[in-house]
Design a protein with these regions (language model features):
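Family-specific functional microsites
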Residues: 3-6, 11, 24, 32-162
Length: 162
């Protein structure tokens, strides 16, 4: 609507008006994501304002676990530490006690033997070997339904260890 007020002309076409509202909403949505500490993780894999493929193609049970992970709802130290105002660098993984317990660490790096066993069972070697943030982003942006199912099983079983 800012465009409407700046240019001071009436918009009679409903589709133009709807597109303007959508564009403004998406701008605000992106701004909120990038300016929030919680949004830092979300912005790794969520680039567009659209429904995610996994929501349409996975079973409800699998969707729940993927969504919990993507919305930082697994009670990882990075999140629980935020609740108690613990400095970010002190939110250490409870399983390996080596580094910050964030989503990247949980999914690809944690050296806890049980997590490693699950990772070896459910995640392809490509993601496990020499993990990096590009692979992490790729894993969370995949379109492969079978891999997403295996990822959801890994998340569910690994979360039970927390």
């Amino acid at each position: 609507m800012g465009f409407i007020f700046i240019n001071q002309f009436p918009v009679y076409d409903k589709s133009v008006f709807n597109q303007m509202l959508r564009d403004q909403f998406v701008q605000k949505w992106l701004s909120d994501i990038y300016s929030s500490s919680r949004g830092q993780f979300y912005s790794v894999f969520k680039k567009d304002f659209c429904i995610e493929n996994y929501l349409l193609r996975l079973s409800e049970h699998s969707r729940i676990w993927i969504t919990k992970f993507r919305t930082s709802n697994l009670h990882l130290p990075i999140e629980t530490g935020r609740w108690y105002n613990i400095p970010r660098e002190e939110r250490i993984c409870h399983l390996c006690k080596e580094t910050i317990g964030d989503e990247y660490h949980f999914l690809l790096v944690c050296k806890n033997e049980n997590i490693i066993t699950l990772r070896n069972k459910y995640l392809p070697n490509y993601y496990r070997a020499y993990p990096n943030h590009a692979k992490f982003e790729g894993l969370l942006s995949i379109c492969n339904v079978e891999l997403y199912k295996r990822l959801s099983i890994f998340i569910r079983k690994a979360a039970a260890l927390l």
